[in-house]
Amino acid sequence: MCKNTTNNSVEQQKSLFSLPEPVLGKKIKVVFNAPDMSSNGGLLLARSSKDTLPSKMGRLIPDDRTQCLVRHSYEEMVCQRVNQILCGYEDANDCDRPRCDSALKMSVGRRPSDEDLCSQATMTRLENNVDSKTLYRIGKLFVEQYVKSFSKPPRHVILDADDTNANTYGAQQLTLFNAYYNEYCHMPLLIFDGVSKKLILPMLRPGRRNKSLNVSRILRRVVEYLHECWPNTVIELRGDSHFCSREFMDWAWSKWYVRYLTGLSGNTKLLDIVDKPRRRAENDFKKALEKLHGSDSKDNVVIRRYFKLDYKAQSWKHEQRVIAKIEVSAKGTNIRFVVTKNRNNSPKTIYKRYCKRGEMELWIKDVKYFKADRMSCAKVRSP
């Protein structure tokens, strides 16, 4: 006997796509026998509120058009662009295909019977109309949204910063060849919350690693804004050696609320300082190999040692605390350095905290899953 599933009530069908807010005062009833079908019904779930981040971004773009002739507001167009990306239409050139889709219309606040959404030409004009001041306001909006996501000020915030490649395949502005990735690309800077995994700020940058001075200016603005919102919160920067800039360390030295935990590139002076501990670790590794039995594998033998030292580079104003990790295995000797403002915890604890920044690579992958690295626009200022 087969169970009859064709007589599902309308109330059961409505519960699958219930919305907290109707579209232009009209309730949405989901049925599967209407002539106007859409495969993008999930957009109605994504439209949980009118005051979304894309809506706020659209309101930040100055509109110099003759308003009596405007048929598509910038707020609606930005929402349309974002929702199209969710549906798999990543380029502005794709606007002509889904512009008449009923679900896409309702996701931006229109009725299915209303006129179609904007075309490719209109969307392209919007993207080319964005200037640097607007991009700055949008970047500030991201940080403001991050602050508003907390019900109360946190005691401690970790800023995980890193850049990644966004490959380009045309004549885009500021696209450069990156030898590490062996590709022509942009190098966006991404800042995440290391605890809550929230995206704080994305920023598109040229296709090479940014100079430390430019990165320091960006980080300082973010930290200063967070401190204005949360005066009693400790803000800690965590990143690789690229973010170990003397400008940021010198600025943060007298700020009690700013800490940093970044990688440090090794040099001959640092290697000379840890030479004796390195030799002791290598001797311990040899002794461990001698104790192995015939069935044991030497690949399982790893010797790790952690040390702290005070070090001052020639360009630094102040002496910094440096953590050295010496790892000896069958693959050889690996020495890593980390510079920090934290002088309370043990060297091993500090280095373990630094290693947690590796989780950020997974968060960057999640961002790329939503086509954030799609670089189809010729102008670098185009969203």
Regions found by a protein language model. Name each.
Residues 170, 245-250, 271-275:
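A short acidic (Asp/Glu
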Residues 158, 236, 259:
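Hydrophobic "anchor" residues on beta-strands that sit immediately upstream
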